[in-house]
Swiss-Prot record:
GO terms for cellular component: nucleus. GO terms for biological process: regulation of defense response; regulation of jasmonic acid mediated signaling pathway; response to wounding. A motif (Jas) lies at residues 123-148. Keywords: Jasmonic acid signaling pathway, Nucleus, Transcription, Transcription regulation, Ubl conjugation. A motif (Nuclear localization signal) lies at residues 125-132. The keyword Nucleus applies. Induction: By jasmonate, wounding, and cold, drought and salt stresses. Down-regulated by abscisic acid (ABA). Ubiquitinated. Targeted for degradation by the SCF(COI1) E3 ubiquitin ligase-proteasome pathway during jasmonate signaling. Residues 65-100 form the Tify domain. Repressor of jasmonate responses. PROSITE patterns: TIFY (PS51320). This is Protein TIFY 11e.
Length: 166
């Protein structure tokens, strides 16, 4: 009994020492990774981009003038329209006008109707094409014969094989 208690206490002492060693090693590892993480710094994706912005800021008074009349780009009906020197109040008025209008221009209605007419003919053309394909497929299948026919079926029909009937 005394030997078991001594073995248990030695085992507990060994486990305690091992635990302290693992904790110390973990702390050292964490300190190294923290130092390595602090040394990492992101690289700029566009190195010249920040320089161009600094030069514009140094020019000074140009920034106030450019905000009053800036360039406006409009995408409408598949077209791109670029307006130079568009004042902010006119841009806001144009946006309000675009938001309030709900109608579709007559040109778009005509092109939509023409596109619908072309797509109506498409299913008929597909159907005819499918019919031609199926007819050709039938011909190919008939030429090949049955897919699982045995080559020696003719010999079996003649009776050249041995019958094991008792």
């Amino acid at each position: 009994m005394a030997a078991e208690a001594a073995a248990t206490s030695r085992f507990a002492a060994a486990c305690g020492a091992l635990s302290q060693y693992v904790r110390a090693a973990d702390n050292v590892h964490r300190a190294r990774t923290a130092a390595a993480a602090a040394a990492v710094r992101p690289l700029p994706l566009m190195p010249g981009a920040d320089v161009a912005g600094d030069e514009r800021e140094e020019e000074g008074g140009g920034a106030a003038a450019s905000s009053a009349a800036a360039q406006m780009t409009i995408f409408y009906g598949g077209r791109v329209l670029v307006l130079d020197e568009c004042p902010a109040d006119r841009a806001a008025a144009l946006l309000r006008l675009a938001a309030s209008s709900r109608g579709v221009p007559r040109d778009d209605l005509a092109s939509t109707a023409a596109a619908a007419g072309e797509s109506a003919d498409l299913p008929v053309a597909r159907k005819a094409s499918l019919q031609r394909f199926m007819e050709k497929r039938k011909g190919r299948l008939a030429a090949r014969g049955q897919p699982y026919r045995r080559h020696d079926a003719a010999a079996a029909a003649r009776g050249d094989h041995l019958a094991l009937a008792l």
